[in-house]
């Protein structure tokens, strides 16, 4: 009689976290400050060939999205193509700062980024 035991160093069901080869300069702890003038930024995932939008929140409230590859928030646009995520943020002409949080998913791997745009200079 013999007994065999198997042990895995990777727990079953846990995916590798998403890793990024390209991120915008200024990204700190998942948050990016954006000037009132707006702009665009690019993220490139190096360990997943594709991923999709899991959720979008504006000022803490979930927004309804019908596409997993593109989201138009009116003052910002999120586009995913293959392993790249592009964010375009329009000029803020209001006297209030604004923000949105984007959660992306690749199977059981998730990542979240918050974008905070400055108010227009009066």
Map each language-model feature to its residues.
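Surface-exposed binding patches on compact interaction domains or structured appendages
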Residues: 20, 31, 38-86
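Bacterial Sec-dependent N-terminal signal peptides
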Residues: 1-27
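A mature extracytoplasmic/lumenal domain signature
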Residues: 47, 91-93, 106, 119
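A short beta-strand micro-motif common to beta-rich folds, especially ectodomain repeats
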Residues: 94-108
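Generic structural detector for well-ordered beta-strands
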Residues: 33, 44, 86-88, 103, ...
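Short, solvent-exposed, Trp/other aromatic-anchored flexible loops in extracytoplasmic proteins
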Residues: 84-97
């Amino acid at each position: 009689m013999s007994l065999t035991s198997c042990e895995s160093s990777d727990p079953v069901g846990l995916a590798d976290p998403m890793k990024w080869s390209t991120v915008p300069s200024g990204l700190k702890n998942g948050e990016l400050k954006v000037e009132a003038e707006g702009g665009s930024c690019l993220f490139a995932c190096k360990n997943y060939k594709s991923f999709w939008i899991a959720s979008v929140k504006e000022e803490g409230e979930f927004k309804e999205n019908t596409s997993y590859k593109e989201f138009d928030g009116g003052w910002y646009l999120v586009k995913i193509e293959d392993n790249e995520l592009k964010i375009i943020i329009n000029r803020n002409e209001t006297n209030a700062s604004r923000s949105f949080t984007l959660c992306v998913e690749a199977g059981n791997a998730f990542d979240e980024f918050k974008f905070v745009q400055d108010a227009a200079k009066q």
